[in-house]
């Protein structure tokens, strides 16, 4: 008989409860290139040793349960169990540890973010022996990432589709986010695109409400896109939110967007779920649609420093599940986002190979091989005075999205769009000439406003607006 299935009825098995660390804490283990590696921030209950806490995480997120079971003898735990292979204290924190866990690749279904998360962050987060638990990072091996399609198109293909190079893309979320009729909504889209923006956007909670049904919105937005393209000679788009109550309805909306000939649709990937998101990403690649991703609900999961899932993990999961854009914070706007941490997961979204760098919160070297990259979207409380910093922080491969910073212009939507486009072009030109955007940014904007009355008006309106609060999530 195979040693995996051999049992001895006369001996039976030793029933009862035993410490997790006896089986799942293996500091001598050498990780394999095919292992999925996880870094957990563990806060044990008083009296629980860190080795037992780390082993409990490895056990409960893989093959373990609370007691010994006779069916353990029917398989090879050494082959399938998760292993806590290293534990280190968190500097400056009492009774917090980083527990490193290795998972064999055979534990996970190919091409399924849903299955990966169900194992790694499933029941274990409610484990009583832990006061708190946070998944800080994952190392996804090429052997697993290659089972995913990833983004429908990626950064280079998107630039080729839009014929836009050498600068960040400009967007705008239509406001008020709820309450407009479809025709008035389309009018706002047209004015913003005509003024110089590349994209406009449905807000995350715009789906198909009584005041504006999705089909009407799609039709009027498509009309706005075609009219703005004819006037400007540029390719334009609007993120039509296909998020719906069922996957079938979501795909139906994406099909209608394709029939209208628009370039991009949108999905709320956390509230919609990874299964729905992956299905939509596959449809988008097959049918030539770009896919914009909103991260609504992320702060419920990632904002607390000692419990939940860090956004860098959610960003990696999105790259695997599929999306061409994803909101990534602004550093300088109204939403949470510390600079080094933000730049860490921005690199994880865009680059092919990212070295371990604990100063930016990156616990593992990540090799994406040929998986396409995702454009980070900076959105939330930003305006023209932020343009130099945003251009310097995010670089060309990004989308800078101004909602109130466009629609709040005193002269209207189109002048607001003009102001943002002029500010962006001025910053890109100054950077290309070798000027320091971080040091000379305000002067660059003032110089540009001398020949752009739209920019001058925007500068006056938002000269005193700041969002200066300490970040909750720090290294």
From Swiss-Prot:
**Active site feature:** 175 (proton acceptor), 294 (proton acceptor)
- Record keywords, A-Z: Acetylation, Calvin cycle, Carbon dioxide fixation, Chloroplast, Disulfide bond, Lyase, Magnesium, Metal-binding, Methylation, Monooxygenase, Oxidoreductase, Photorespiration, Photosynthesis, Plastid
UniProt cofactor note: Binds 1 Mg(2+) ion per subunit.
Q: What's the cofactor?
A: Mg(2+)
Q: Which reaction does it catalyse?
A: 2 (2R)-3-phosphoglycerate + 2 H(+) = D-ribulose 1,5-bisphosphate + CO2 + H2O; D-ribulose 1,5-bisphosphate + O2 = 2-phosphoglycolate + (2R)-3-phosphoglycerate + 2 H(+)
Which SUPFAM superfamilies does the protein's record reference? RuBisCo, C-terminal domain, RuBisCO, large subunit, small (N-terminal) domain
Matches recorded under InterPro entries: RuBisCO, RuBisCo_large_chain_AS, RuBisCO_lsu_C, RuBisCO_lsu_C_sf, RuBisCO_lsu_fd_N, RuBisCO_lsu_N_sf, RuBisCO_lsuI
The UniProt record gives the binding positions of substrate as 123, 173, 177, 295, 327, 379
Give the N6,N6,N6-trimethyllysine positions (modified residues): 14
Q: Where in the cell is it found?
A: Plastid, Chloroplast
Q: Which Gene Ontology molecular function entries are recorded, alphabetically?
A: magnesium ion binding; monooxygenase activity; ribulose-bisphosphate carboxylase activity
- Which residues participate in Mg(2+) binding? 201, 203-204
- Record-listed N-acetylproline modification sites: 3
According to the UniProt record, list the residues that bear N6-carboxylysine. Answer: 201
- Post-translational modification, briefly? The disulfide bond which can form in the large chain dimeric partners within the hexadecamer appears to be associated with oxidative stress and protein turnover.
| Propeptide span(s) | 1-2
Kindly list the GO CC terms recorded for this protein: chloroplast
* Something else known: The basic functional RuBisCO is composed of a large chain homodimer in a 'head-to-tail' conformation. In form I RuBisCO this homodimer is arranged in a barrel-like tetramer with the small subunits forming a tetrameric 'cap' on each end of the 'barrel'.
What name does UniProt use for this protein?
Ribulose bisphosphate carboxylase large chain
Q: Which organism is it from?
A: Buxus microphylla
Q: Supply the gene name.
A: rbcL
